[in-house]
Amino acid sequence: KSTVARHIAHQLGLLYLDTGAMYRALTWFVLSQGVDPTDPLAVAELLPTCDIKLTSQGKDQENPQPPEVWVNGQSVTQAIRTPEVTAQVSTIAAQAAVREALVKQQQQYGVQGGIVADGRDTGTHVFPHAELKIFLTASVAERARRRQRDLAAQSLPVPELSELETLIAERDRKDSSRDISPLRQAEDATEVITDDLSAEDVIDKICAMYQEI
């Protein structure tokens, strides 16, 4: 979904907000500090010391890049995509203090409008009154294959497909069953199943929807 959101923002001249990267950045910081990600009090104590920023990586017209992700002035753009972070991000994201802090930051980006935001609770909780909501979905197997390609493109270690499928399925389970802002489709969102669609097909489809509002 980040690839699609990034290209849509580029095509429409809007700001791209990768909310998932913010949760990954905090997860990376928690792990880097040796804090137990399952300890909400310890994680909450770290929140004031974790300054997360997203900046543009340039103006590549053909291939818009993901935002550069910074934690306390250190670039963590690649570090937040590792399997270690992926395995813990749902645990961190389910914590009330974490969601309250990061949702406030995300909503500040949206005050003026004109953004494309992606994230697992973006349409239901972060921006419930958005003009256009898309619920992108694909099978676990397809998402695992895409994750392998993404990691390889970033020259990061690429786990076995079965390992990624397990990680993704477990993350879905955690995110769908959490008490705070669970993963679900907003009632006014349009579902787009992407298994048999290229990224370009999905981008064109959503851009056409945007032009109709």
What are these regions (language model features)?
Residues 2:
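Walker A/P-loop
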Residues 7:
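Active-site signature of alpha/beta-hydrolase-fold catalytic machinery across serine-
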Residues 11-80:
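N-terminal phosphate/diphosphate-binding loop that engages ATP/GTP or pyrophosphate donors
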Residues 16, 133-135, 189-192:
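Conserved beta-strand scaffold positions in the cores of enzyme catalytic domains, especially
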Residues 20, 73, 102, 116, ...:
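Residue-level signal for inorganic ion chemistry
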Residues 68-77, 86, 145-154, 173-213:
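NTP-dependent small-molecule kinase module
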Residues 77-153:
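ATP-dependent NMP and nucleoside kinases share a basic, alpha-helical "lid"
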Residues 121-122, 128, 134-135, 139-145, ...:
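Anionic, Ser/Thr-rich low-complexity intrinsically disordered regions
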